[in-house]
Amino acid sequence: MSKDEYLITDAPLKALTVFAMPMILGSFFQQVYNMADSIIVGQFVGSSALAAVGACAALTNVFICVALGAGVGAGVLVSRYFGAKEYGKMKTIVSTSLISFLLLSILLGIFGFCFSHAMMSGLQTPADILEEAVLYLRVYFVGFPFLFMYNILSTMFTSIGESKIPLVLLIFSSILNIVMDLWMVAGLGLGVFGAAFATLIAQGISAVFSLLIFFNRMRRYQSPFQRFDGRGLRSMLRIAVPSVLQQSTVSIGMMIVQAVVNPFGTQALAGYAATMRVENVFSLIFVSIGNAVSPYVSQNLGAGKTERIKKGYHAALVLDVCFAALAFLVIETLHTQISSLFLGKDGTALAYQVSEDYMRSLGYFFIFMGIKMATDGVLRGLGIMQPFLIANMVNLAIRLSVALICAPRFGIDFVWLAVPAGWLANFLVSYAALRKSWPGEKVESSRIFS
């Protein structure tokens, strides 16, 4: 038995823990990578520059979610064929996805660059930080194809049970990003532009290394394959499109929240931007667990070991409870210190109040996000996409309703309630669908993916 096949052989909790931990650590370094801009800009330039960088975060996350969702669409099929040892079909999906998504990333980068000003204006970005926010965003979109392809390749690695290589590459690129940030922002005084350009360089190097290592790994599987397969692309898109929408509900929700927060002023936005970075750190832990569940489910489905799927789901819930408790303890103990890390001495009392209120609210309710992501991960791994999509649209609708209706009338505190309310509603719908969809021990994987 190959060591790459531990997701279909080891005890479910052990297999998921071994598989998910590098992904969780990778998520941490991904956020270190992202937070470096905010921390260094906030400390060396000021809270207005921090607000400019933070104002871009919700929008850039939407584009990142397109990359993540596209990767999931390919990854579910790669996992299925890997579990079934159909390596020729696996490599066909890999080649088709890389060609298709490289073109998509270039088109999205051009679109984002051209419409940066319009998008930031549409989010009601305060006038005093608008131009810096647009500058940061345009540099970001120049490097977007690198970021997109890195995320696709990272998903490919995890689909074949390899989660350590993306972690090593993320650690390397995170360190490089911090060094470049310090040099360009603190050393050269390039401000917001320097922070964005440092990130672009780190993303580019990481993407190139990922591509070279992945191609080398594929040489292990000597099977003939097609460079491009239209049917394979359609199969990917049937999973990828709902996955993009699911991944995007988190970021679109953040954009909605930001649009509601923006009229409260620059200092309220600075406080929100500080906590949004913290939210991203913990959110990506639960996203990583959900993303680990999908290839686990898909590989076991492909291998015909459907009895392991429910056990894997329960193992994921155990991991979610543990990390939700950790998030609560960290936030309750260190919320003031965490806020000061971003806001520094330049932050006003309002900025600190907004940051700490939002952060503590999240700490109480992260468990809802955890169980939602695990349940969604199982549905995605089974290829059951319609209820998966409906559940995430319910999530977005709840966020819209609570944030847009309650916050302007009752105050900014109601913004924070919109997020966990959406998570809980999403879980309830997803779980109801999952209870009706557990595959029997003799279910064939082709029935699920057709």
Language model region names:
Residues L50-I110, L147-P166, G271-H335, M369-G383, ...:
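Small-residue-rich hydrophobic transmembrane alpha-helices
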Residues M1-A20, V78-G143, G187-V241, V297-Y364, ...:
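Short alpha-helical transmembrane segments in multi-pass integral membrane proteins
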Residues F28, V32-L50, M120-A127, W183-L190, ...:
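Helix-terminus/linker motif at the lipid-water interface of multi-pass membrane proteins
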Residues V62-C65, N177-D181, S206-L211, V281-L284, ...:
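Hydrophobic transmembrane alpha-helices of multi-pass small-molecule transporters
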Residues V18-D37, V139, S173, A202-S206, ...:
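Transmembrane helical elements of multi-pass membrane transporters/channels
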Residues V18, V41-N61, A127-E132, V192-F193, ...:
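Interfacial/gating helices of multi-pass transporter permease domains
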Residues G71, Y140-T158, P166-S174, A195-V208, ...:
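Short runs within selected transmembrane alpha-helices of multi-pass transporters and secretion channels
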Residues T9, L13-V32, A36, L59-V66, ...:
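Residue-level signal for short hydrophobic patches within transmembrane helices
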